[in-house]
Amino acid sequence: MLKSAFRALGDLFSPEFRSVLFKALGLTIALFIAVLIIAEMLIASFTHFSWPWADRLVEVGTGLALLVAFFFLMSPVTAAFAGLFLDQIAERVEERHYPWDPRGTALPAGRAILISIQFFIVVLVVNLAVLPMVFFGVGAFVLVAANAYLIGREYFEMVAMRHMPLEEARMLRKENSPTVFIAALLPAFMTIVPFLNLAVPLFSTAYFTHLFKSVQASSA
C-alpha cells in the first residue's frame, strides 16, 4: 500500500499528469466564469430597484455567493472534468510501471462521461449531507471516512474495468474492501486540504492503478 502511494506520488509530477490537471482546472475556471457572466446578465435584466445602490448590492452579493461556491465546488468539479482524462493517466502508469502486463482497454467515452457525472453528483450530495457535522467533534472524521469509501469504490472499479467487466471489477473490490478502504483514506484526507485536493483525481488514478496491480498479483 505504501509502495503504491510512493509510486503514485512520483507519477504525479510527470508531464502527462500536469497536462491533465491544467486541462481540468482550465475547464473548471472557464465554467465558473461563464456562470458568473450569465448570472450578472440575468440580474441586470430582471432586477430593477428604485435605488441604484440596491442593484449594486444584489450584484456584489451574487458575486460573493458565486465566489464561495467556486471554492466549495472547485474540487468536485475539477474531479468531474479530470474524469474525462483518467483513462490516459491509467494507461501511462501501466506503460511506465507494468510494460510486461496485458494492456487495459480504455472505457468508451460515453461511459467515462457518465461515470464522471455520477461520481460528481454522489460526492457533492454526500459532502453536503456531512458538512454540518464538521462543526462538531466527529465531523471531519465522518467526512474523511465517507470520501474514503466513495474514492475507493469509484477509482478501484474504474481502474479494474479497464481489464475486466464491471461485475468482476465490483466483486474484486468487495473481496478486498478493507484494503481498498484503508488505502483510500490517504486521498480522502487530501480532499479536505485546500489546493491539495485538486490533485486527488490524478493521484487516486495512479494510486489505485498500482493497488489494483498489487491485488491482482496476490489473487493470481
Q: Where do the model's predicted regions map?
A:
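Short alpha-helical linear motifs
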Residues: 45-50, 131-135, 166-172, 208-210
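Internal, well-ordered alpha-helical scaffold/interface segments
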Residues: 91, 95, 111, 115, ...
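Membrane-interface segments at transmembrane-helix boundaries
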Residues: 2-5, 76-113, 154-174, 211-220
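Hydrophobic alpha-helical transmembrane segments in multi-pass membrane proteins
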Residues: 27-39, 70-71, 118-144, 183-201
